[in-house]
Amino acid sequence: DKPLLDTARDFVIIVVFSLVLFFILRFLISIKRRNKRKQLHLLLGPSEKQFLDFLRLNYRQGYVSGHQIVAFFGKHKSSPESQRQFRAKLIEGLNKSLGLIFPGEQVLDIQADDKDQRMLTYRLTDSMYQALKNL
């Protein structure tokens, strides 16, 4: 058998190595998160950033309607066609930007409105909300 001093030294070496490995992994994870935050900041335009914040704030309440999105951006006095174009451009920009940062992830959960089947309601998917929350 080994003397007690050698066993204690081996134990201390294992603990120190484990701690160093743990801190290296934490550091690498934080660098990856920081890079994703930077990418998000660079790729999203001002309207897409506001739209993403709006979707994140309303995530727990459920789906947001097209009317709510238009009212949030102050476009409610525009013609219905320009409102539709604005929403389409906003959603397309958000989908493209987040699709580049999180490849393979579905960004929005889009459903028909219960009251008016012609209108759509929007919500971040659960996986996207969690990914953004962890940044």
How would you describe each model-predicted region?
Residues 41-77, 94:
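Short amphipathic alpha-helical recognition elements used for nucleic-acid or partner binding
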Residues 2-15, 21-29, 40, 55-58, ...:
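DNA-binding patch around the recognition helix
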Residues 63, 77-79, 102, 106:
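Secondary-structure boundary/capping signal
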Residues 32:
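Short acidic (Asp/Glu) and glycine-rich catalytic loops that position anionic groups and cofactors
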Residues 75-86:
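Short, positively charged loop/turn segments that connect secondary-structure elements
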Residues 46, 85-89:
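A generic alpha-helix signature
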